[in-house]
């Protein structure tokens, strides 16, 4: 048991709660006819229904279409179809389009239903996945918490008092609680990696363009990408492969790769920089001592695996945060226009929209021109190392209501204090993976990120799989409180 007196946070390892199956477990059960897709989907829908009043992971549950798709998947399997995710229940974040369903993106008010599936949903369905629902996210994906007047507060499966993080907090909560074995999220400043860190999950932010953002040629001026949350590296890699690919209109189209091929293959001896220096943002951030210790323990594990670990920090410079701010807030302005006039926005969103409008012309163009120089400067660390290891967050997950009464300045200061280190890789467009790294003395999950150069998902996934094999993190799961 991981936990502390006075806290409802905790984990169990192997006994007590029923073991949660992995996605690969479910694929085996389907292949051997031990279970049908309809049975799996009904099980997932029941778990969602029971948990929704307390955990609140979902914005929309697609009961009717999910059951129809499950029945179709069973017929496909009986006919010999071997699609990679055939019959597997999957959740998607409520910032991607599912035909016939509004994409509210955390807002309150009327949003017209989407007319078509977006490309990532289309690819998941083509791979046989059954979309059971759309998960909660904070408003326009801006913050590392998942709450808002349109849906309430999403809770952390490891502690009902804490946030799962954000903005892909609903997806993280759904996977950590076992409602689904994997979910799609998006990451524009850490929005997959942060909730993955705070819910004991693998969270992959892939190379920009690895997963299409179509019908958007790019999202938030290229800083936001779609990615995957799962409990194991193998599960995350399988879903990433199924979701990856491009259409002609995508602005970013990296060379294709099958990342699941790298699971179980040793990456060879690597040189890894252990970095605890945060990029400049104008706000102060202090690394929690237990997160520092956890990061150092992962470094020790990597050395035992035969890698060389040295202290080292990327050269972030002073301008990087300004370039990021211009691209991200200008992207907010574009998304708000897409939603229309019938949504009610948080006052902090309105403030950020004003900034985005101001920055959306000459300053945005300047920020984009600086990308190559930013990549050269920060990427110079890869002249001497292969991977950067860093804390995913500076602090453990905050309370679920910690941000409710804060204004714009207070929110910005609080989120930088908690999460100062993930956003540069969004600006650069490069892959990064959060992996579980233990727990605080209060039983709250800790994560670290493996950060690589362009198109390095294979190496990072191979390295993450090595860490999973020696740490056994997938055997640990939260005590169930959300069914009562």
Swiss-Prot record:
Pfam families: Amidase. Its EC number is 3.5.1.4. Transmembrane segments: none annotated. It comes from the Bacteria. The active site is at 93 (charge relay system), 167 (charge relay system), 191 (acyl-ester intermediate). Belongs to the amidase family. This is Putative amidase AmiA2. It comes from Mycobacterium bovis (strain ATCC BAA-935 / AF2122/97). The lineage of its organism: Bacteria, Bacillati, Actinomycetota, Actinomycetes, Mycobacteriales.
């Amino acid at each position: 048991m991981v936990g502390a007196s006075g806290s409802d946070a905790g984990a169990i390892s192997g006994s007590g709660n029923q073991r949660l199956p992995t996605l690969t477990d479910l694929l085996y059960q389907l292949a051997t006819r031990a279970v049908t897709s309809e049975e799996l989907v009904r099980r997932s829908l029941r778990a969602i229904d029971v948990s929704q009043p307390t955990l609140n992971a979902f914005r929309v549950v697609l009961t009717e279409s999910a059951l129809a798709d499950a029945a179709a998947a069973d017929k496909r399997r009986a006919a010999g179809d071997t699609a990679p995710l055939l019959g597997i229940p999957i959740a998607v974040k409520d910032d991607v389009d599912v035909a016939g369903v509004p994409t509210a993106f955390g807002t309150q008010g009327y949003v017209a239903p989407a007319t078509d599936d977006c490309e990532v949903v289309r690819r998941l369905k083509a791979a046989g996945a059954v979309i059971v629902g759309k998960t909660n996210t904070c408003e326009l994906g801006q913050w590392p918490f998942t709450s808002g007047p349109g849906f309430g507060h999403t809770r952390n499966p490891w502690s009902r008092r804490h946030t799962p993080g954000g903005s892909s907090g609903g997806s993280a909560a759904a996977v950590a609680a076992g409602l689904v074995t994997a979910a799609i999220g998006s990451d524009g400043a850490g929005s997959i990696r942060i909730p993955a860190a705070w819910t004991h999950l693998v969270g992959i932010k892939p190379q920009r363009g690895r997963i299409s953002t179509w019908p958007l040629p790019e999202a938030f001026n290229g800083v936001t990408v779609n990615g995957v949350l799962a409990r194991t590296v193998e599960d995350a890699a399988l879903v990433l492969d199924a979701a990856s690919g491009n259409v002609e209109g995508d602005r970013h189209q990296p060379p294709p790769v099958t990342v699941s091929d790298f699971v179980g293959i040793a990456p060879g001896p690597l040189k890894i920089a252990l970095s605890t220096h945060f990029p400049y943002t104008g706000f102060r951030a202090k690394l929690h001592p237990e997160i520092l210790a956890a990061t150092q323990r992962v470094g020790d594990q990597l050395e035992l695996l035969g890698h060389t670990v040295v202290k080292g920090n990327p050269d972030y410079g002073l301008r990087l945060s300004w370039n990021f701010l211009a691209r991200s807030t200008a992207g907010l302005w574009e998304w708000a226009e897409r939603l229309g006039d019938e949504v009610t926005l948080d006052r902090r969103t309105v403030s950020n929209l004003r900034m985005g409008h101001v920055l959306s012309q000459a300053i945005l163009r300047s920020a984009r021109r600086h990308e190559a120089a930013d990549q050269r400067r920060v990427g110079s660390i890869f002249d001497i190392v292969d991977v950067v290891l860093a804390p995913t967050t500076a602090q453990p997950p905050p309370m679920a209501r910690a941000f409710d009464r804060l204004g714009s300045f207070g929110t910005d200061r609080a989120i930088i204090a908690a999460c100062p280190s993930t956003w540069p890789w969004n600006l650069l467009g490069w892959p990064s993976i959060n992996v579980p790294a233990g727990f605080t003395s209060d039983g709250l999950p800790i994560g670290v990120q493996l950060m690589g150069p362009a198109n390095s998902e294979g190496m990072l996934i191979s390295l993450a799989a090595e860490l999973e094999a020696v740490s056994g993190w997938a055997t640990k799961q939260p005590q169930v409180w959300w069914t009562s």
